[in-house]
Each structure stands twice: as structure tokens, then as C-alpha cells.
């Protein structure tokens, strides 16, 4: 609902609900992995997308192109075994992140979550890279840790009032750790996600465990977490 101006993935500051124009442009251009939102860069020109960004902002009467408050990245910390180990400790310390994402980052903690509308939500399984809404790059993960996700239970860990607040350096360490969890997942190969029909003579087996199916080429059925519930 563009009239609510509820933009979850943005690069503006923690207390700034309005996104940068580039944030909206990126979502239209690249889409959102793990959702029904496709990328339009193969269909719309760059100017078309810019025009669409300006049009979408009208619904919520957004005038700023680049709000004053922006994310403070400080000095980016490159991923390393030491940084990942430090992020691992911070992730689990006081159940800072594991309270929702689970001890192994699989989103399997028992805490029941609801978004601001009261709908049931599920924490991200951080070991499945194809479900990340933006990307698995540490810089994008740092943004989520810093700003939180508007309208959801994902908080900002840059909030000075939070008992679980992280410094800029600590946020980079957690981002590197989370990126390492994503890298441990097995990506789905795009060429294996299309079901290719093969013409056969005679009848097909009626039972799913029939040995005749062993001769069929395997296909990956690409499932995405599009769950809505209360």
C-alpha cells in the first residue's frame, strides 16, 4: 500500500521513515528475491524506472529525494575469521539475534512474532541465501541491522535506547557473521528450476514410489517463503 509509505528496505537513517529515491529505484529495477516482486530492468528503461519512482511517491506525498538523515557506515570492516568470530559472539550474546533467528540462524526460535498490522511473521532463515530480500552482501545486511525493518519485529540495533544496541564496528562484525551463514547455504541453480516435460509412450506409473520414476531427470522445485497468517 504505497499510501502508507511503509518502506521496509531503505538506506536512510534509523529514525527516518522516508526512503531515498535510489532505494525505491533499486527495488523496481532488481525486484525482491524470495517474493512475487520481479525485477523490471529488462522491460523498463532507466528513465522509465525513475519516472515510476517519482509517481509512486505521490501516493504518500513524499517530496524528499534524499532525506537528511542517512545511515552512518563508519569504516567498513572486511570479512575475516576474526570478524566472523566476533560477530558470532555478539549474535548470541544475551540472545541478541538468536532470540528470533535461532541459535544456528535458521529462524527456528520459538518466539511468536507479529508485524504492526497484527499478522503473523517468521524470522528469516539466515542460512538460505535465496530468501534474503535485498542481498547477502555484508553492506546490505549492515543496513538491516542498523535501521531494522519498518513495520516488523526486526528492530534497529543502532537505537541508543536499546539494551541490545551495537556500535558501528559491532554491526559490521555481525553483518560479516550473518553473511557467512548465507554463504554456507546451498544455492538453487536457476537452470534446475524449470520443469521440462518429456513425451513418453504408454501410460505413466500411478504410484509415486514406482521404480520407473528413477529414470526421470531430477528437477529442483524452487519454493519461496510467501507466508501470511495470524
Give the role of each language-model region.
Residues 62-93, 185-189:
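Electrostatic cytochrome c docking/interface patches
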Residues 97, 123, 194:
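A residue-level signal for beta-strand positions that form part of recognition/binding surfaces
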Amino acid at each position: 500500500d504505497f499510501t502508507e509509505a511503509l518502506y521496509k528496505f531503505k538506506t536512510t537513517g534509523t529514525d527516518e521513515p522516508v526512503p531515498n529515491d535510489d532505494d525505491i529505484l533499486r527495488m523496481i529495477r532488481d525486484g525482491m528475491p524470495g517474493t512475487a516482486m520481479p525485477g523490471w530492468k529488462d522491460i523498463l528503461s532507466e528513465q522509465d524506472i525513475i519516472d515510476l519512482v517519482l509517481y509512486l511517491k505521490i501516493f504518500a506525498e513524499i517530496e524528499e529525494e534524499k532525506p537528511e538523515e542517512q545511515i552512518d557506515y563508519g569504516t567498513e570492516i572486511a570479512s575475516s575469521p576474526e570478524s566472523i568470530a566476533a560477530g558470532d559472539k555478539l549474535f548470541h550474546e544475551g540472545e541478541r539475534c538468536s532470540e528470533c533467528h535461532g541459535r544456528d540462524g535458521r529462524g527456528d526460535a520459538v518466539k511468536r512474532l507479529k508485524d504492526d498490522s497484527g499478522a503473523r511473521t517468521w524470522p528469516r532463515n539466515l542460512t538460505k541465501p535465496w530468501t534474503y530480500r535485498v542481498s547477502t552482501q555484508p553492506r546490505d545486511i549492515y543496513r538491516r541491522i542498523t535501521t531494522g525493518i519498518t513495520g516488523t519485529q526486526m528492530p534497529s540495533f543502532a537505537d541508543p535506547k536499546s539494551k541490545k544496541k551495537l556500535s558501528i564496528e559491532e554491526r559490521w562484525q555481525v553483518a560479516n557473521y550473518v553473511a557467512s551463514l548465507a554463504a554456507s547455504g546451498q544455492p538453487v541453480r536457476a537452470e534446475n528450476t524449470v520443469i521440462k516435460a518429456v513425451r513418453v509412450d504408454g501410460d505413466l506409473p500411478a504410484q509415486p514410489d514406482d521404480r520407473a520414476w528413477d529414470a526421470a531427470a531430477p528437477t529442483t522445485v524452487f519454493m519461496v517463503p510467501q507466508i501470511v497468517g495470524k
